[in-house]
């Protein structure tokens, strides 16, 4: 089974992957997954909203957009001490990567010193760090890299062809430019998309082509299933067929064999069997123990129970010789009930 990295995928061959008989597609994806990863390990991340709501963008799916009529209350930038406290709880619970998200079009220069301090403080705990702050200039990317940021998340959201139906305040090229700035600064890229936005099947193929043809490919690829939020233009859109979502995970694994494919937003709408199929298809990363702003993420004990049923262990930070299986004993109830955690579909 060929798992060589490629950056020249075309629509015809990707549509052919999506059209494979389901069992054949799953077998191909799982075989490639086993060539590159331990099939029974999942990387665990935690997300924290460091600044919530009042975003000026017009993303039609998002509760944080000031243009959408949701009940979300805006909040100011969190103090560094609060961020560090949440990161410590996440580490105790078993997360190896701490992701910090702000509802900004782009960070202002006045915000950068606080953001950089957050990165340095979380890094001092021995965790990997990730941020998603909107568009970045080259200089801002350099500053974040200098502070020690490991990953920067900036999703493409959907295909170039469907993009203007979802967002008009930021271009698709703007997103690619930010990813380029992140790469040039020396950081790892976290970039994926959202399915269930009313796109056609061809749009899912096109989105994955855009991601896989990035050179290098993103180290982390979050695949979100739309979380419908009352007050947004997509609140009443038809649900995505479960098998279409699982196929998207499998094709992403085949096209990006060395990337972590994250089963991201939308897991509360998935039963255990669907999540297990996603892991079989090659998903090997989740957001763990979080509460999303717009919908509950599965509670920590539910994830623990599912991992135990499937015989899944959690991945450790590189260089850590001990398993993080003790998350069963150290899960913290306050984190599940906290209102700080960030909407992974944003």
Swiss-Prot record:
One Gene Ontology molecular-function label: 2 iron, 2 sulfur cluster binding
Transmembrane domains' residue ranges: none
Domain Radical SAM core stretches: 40-264
Enzyme class: transferase
Biological process (GO), any one: biotin biosynthetic process
Pathway membership: Cofactor biosynthesis; biotin biosynthesis; biotin from 7,8-diaminononanoate: step 2/2
Keywords on record: 2Fe-2S, 4Fe-4S, Biotin biosynthesis, Iron, Iron-sulfur, Metal-binding, S-adenosyl-L-methionine, Transferase
EC number: 2.8.1.6
Protein residues bound to [4Fe-4S] cluster: 55, 59, 62
S-S bridge residues: none
Residues in the signal sequence: none
Pfam families: BATS, Radical_SAM
CC cofactor: [4Fe-4S] cluster; [2Fe-2S] cluster
Residues that hold [2Fe-2S] cluster according to the record: 99, 130, 190, 262
InterPro entries to which the protein is assigned, alphabetical: Aldolase_TIM, BATS_dom, Biotin_synth/BioAB, Biotin_synthase, Elp3/MiaA/NifB-like_rSAM, rSAM
Cofactor note: Binds 1 [4Fe-4S] cluster. The cluster is coordinated with 3 cysteines and an exchangeable S-adenosyl-L-methionine. Binds 1 [2Fe-2S] cluster. The cluster is coordinated with 3 cysteines and 1 arginine.
Assembly and interaction partners: Homodimer.
Similarity comment text for this entry: Belongs to the radical SAM superfamily. Biotin synthase family.
NCBIfam families registered for this protein in UniProt: bioB
Summary of the function given for this chain in its UniProt record: Catalyzes the conversion of dethiobiotin (DTB) to biotin by the insertion of a sulfur atom into dethiobiotin via a radical-based mechanism.
UniProt cross-references to HAMAP family, sorted A to Z: BioB
Protein name, as recorded: Biotin synthase
Lineage of the organism: Bacteria, Pseudomonadati, Pseudomonadota, Gammaproteobacteria, Alteromonadales
Gene for this chain: bioB
């Amino acid at each position: 089974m060929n798992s060589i990295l490629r950056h020249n995928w075309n629509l015809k061959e990707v549509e052919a992957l999506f059209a494979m008989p389901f069992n054949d597609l799953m077998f191909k994806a799982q075989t490639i997954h086993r060539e590159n990863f331990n099939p029974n390990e999942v990387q665990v991340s935690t997300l924290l909203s460091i600044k919530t709501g009042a975003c000026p963008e017009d993303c039609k799916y998002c509760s944080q957009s000031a243009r959408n009529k949701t009940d979300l209350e805006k909040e100011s930038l969190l103090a560094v001490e609060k961020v560090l406290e949440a990161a410590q709880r996440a580490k105790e619970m078993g997360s190896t990567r701490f992701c910090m998200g702000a509802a900004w079009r782009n960070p202002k220069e006045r915000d950068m010193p606080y953001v950089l301090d957050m990165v340095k403080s979380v890094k001092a705990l021995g965790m990997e760090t990730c941020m998603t702050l909107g568009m970045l200039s080259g200089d801002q990317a350099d500053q974040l890299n200098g502070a020690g940021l490991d990953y920067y998340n900036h999703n493409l959201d959907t295909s170039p062809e469907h993009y203007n139906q979802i967002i008009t305040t930021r271009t698709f090229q703007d997103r690619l430019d930010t990813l380029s700035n992140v790469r040039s600064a020396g950081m790892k890229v976290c970039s994926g998309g959202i399915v269930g936005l009313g796109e056609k099947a061809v749009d899912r193929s096109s989105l994955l082509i855009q991601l896989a043809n990035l050179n290098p490919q993103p180290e982390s690829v979050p695949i979100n299933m739309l979380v419908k939020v009352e007050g947004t233009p997509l609140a009443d859109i038809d649900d995505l067929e479960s098998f279409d979502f699982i196929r998207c995970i499998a094709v992403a694994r085949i096209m990006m064999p060395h990337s972590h494919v994250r089963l991201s937003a939308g897991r509360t709408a998935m039963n255990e069997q669907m999540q297990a199929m996603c892991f079989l298809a090659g998903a090997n990363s989740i957001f763990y123990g979080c509460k999303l702003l717009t919908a509950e993420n599965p509670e920590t004990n539910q994830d623990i129970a599912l991992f135990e049923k499937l015989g899944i262990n959690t991945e450790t930070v590189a260089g850590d010789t001990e398993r993080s299986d003790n998350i069963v004993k150290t899960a913290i109830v306050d984190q599940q009930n906290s209102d700080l955690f960030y909407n992974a579909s944003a």
